[in-house]
Amino acid sequence: MLHPETSPGRGHLLAVLLALLGTTWAEVWPPQLQEQAPMAGALNRKESFLLLSLHNRLRSWVQPPAADMRRLDWSDSLAQLAQARAALCGIPTPSLASGLWRTLQVGWNMQLLPAGLASFVEVVSLWFAEGQRYSHAAGECARNATCTHYTQLVWATSSQLGCGRHLCSAGQTAIEAFVCAYSPGGNWEVNGKTIIPYKKGAWCSLCTASVSGCFKAWDHAGGLCEVPRNPCRMSCQNHGRLNISTCHCHCPPGYTGRYCQVRCSLQCVHGRFREEECSCVCDIGYGGAQCATKVHFPFHTCDLRIDGDCFMVSSEADTYYRARMKCQRKGGVLAQIKSQKVQDILAFYLGRLETTNEVIDSDFETRNFWIGLTYKTAKDSFRWATGEHQAFTSFAFGQPDNHGLVWLSAAMGFGNCVELQASAAFNWNDQRCKTRNRYICQFAQEHISRWGPGS
């Protein structure tokens, strides 16, 4: 067992006095923790740091190695509570055991010694030395020996520490009380036997998800589980700021990329900047790296041209509202069939397309096609996506069949959107908007005019 070295003479004397004179406690209590004003004789910041560092160093020295040992952090609330208990000079009181924090179990190590006999650091080191008499394999202390200070000191799940010291008077003898409080506490018993303080194994190999980091200082023998400083396992370059909740870098102006590693000074003249790719998304009718070039309308992509309007038939399927959005992104709208001529030409084309055209997305539910007509419950009528009233109609026989169930349509999305139905010679049918259909985008003259002149 590794432990801090003390001079042989003084170490032997301390051990004897601990056995003969020292009064010790190592217990678990549900106390009341409150923010209080600093008490006279409380540990200063340097002493607190030394005790915390010593505790963590000793916890990293346990043998066999601990797989789940937590790193301790200093708690001013626990320190105030420990100071208050040290001031009792070993006299138990029920008042400390009552209060608001009954659910928080706190473990205690306490030592009473003649004043000046030992420093707090030496007392903690002697608590750890009790481990020489503790068998981790058997989970018990040697006969007629005390190990409870040791087991509390190395209790794996304890994560907070606070200590206090007080000079007491006992007749003509000055007594010094040393107290440390640990939260959560340890030394739990099952059927009269104290359970082992930690699980053995490779350091940090059994850390829980909330403390998945592994802390190891230069003077530590092994690692201690801690809240990871950087759970994303990444860092942002060029003064980027890491959001550890999303593991995303917020880059300063002029930089982009996952780690802000790409210098980007691109300006989009007619478009918006896509930060993650350092590129421009151009407005309709513009192209080029900076969206500065006026481009011609891509008439070669039209499947049909009717009276100057361009119609594009999708090779993929989607819901009605997603299909409408995709047409809008291209600068058009879902097809608006306002005459028998357009209806006849589309029906003829789609009938031929049914057996000749390949699709890139076979995950569609029907062989039908969305057009830009929906039922508006507020107006109790079908309207085109532009808001225009539907004057021309080509509903199939018996359709629309959900028109009378307005409440059902609104509540469940039945029959609110219109498709060209293959089984009815591509006449219209009202359908659930969440159905996945192919769709037809239309580019009328007002859409095409936004592009550069072309043929």
Curated annotation (Swiss-Prot):
Glycoprotein recorded as keyword: yes
InterPro entries in the cross-refs: C-type_lectin-like, C-type_lectin-like/link_sf, C-type_lectin_CS, CAP_dom, CAP_sf, CRISP-related, CTDL_fold, EGF-like_dom
Every EGF-like domain range: 228-261
Residue stretches making up the C-type lectin domain: 306-442
Gene Ontology molecular function: polysaccharide binding
Pfam family, one: Lectin_C
Glycosylation sites recorded in the entry for this protein: N144
Disulfides per UniProt: C236-C249, C251-C260, C327-C441, C417-C433
GO cellular component, one term: endosome
Compartment list: Secreted; Endoplasmic reticulum; Golgi apparatus; Endosome
Extent of the signal sequence: 1-26
Keywords: Disulfide bond, EGF-like domain, Endoplasmic reticulum, Endosome, Glycoprotein, Golgi apparatus, Lectin, Secreted, Signal
Function: Binds polysaccharides in a Ca(2+)-independent manner.
Protein name from the UniProt record: C-type lectin domain family 18 member B
Lineage, broadest ranks: Eukaryota, Metazoa, Chordata, Craniata, Vertebrata
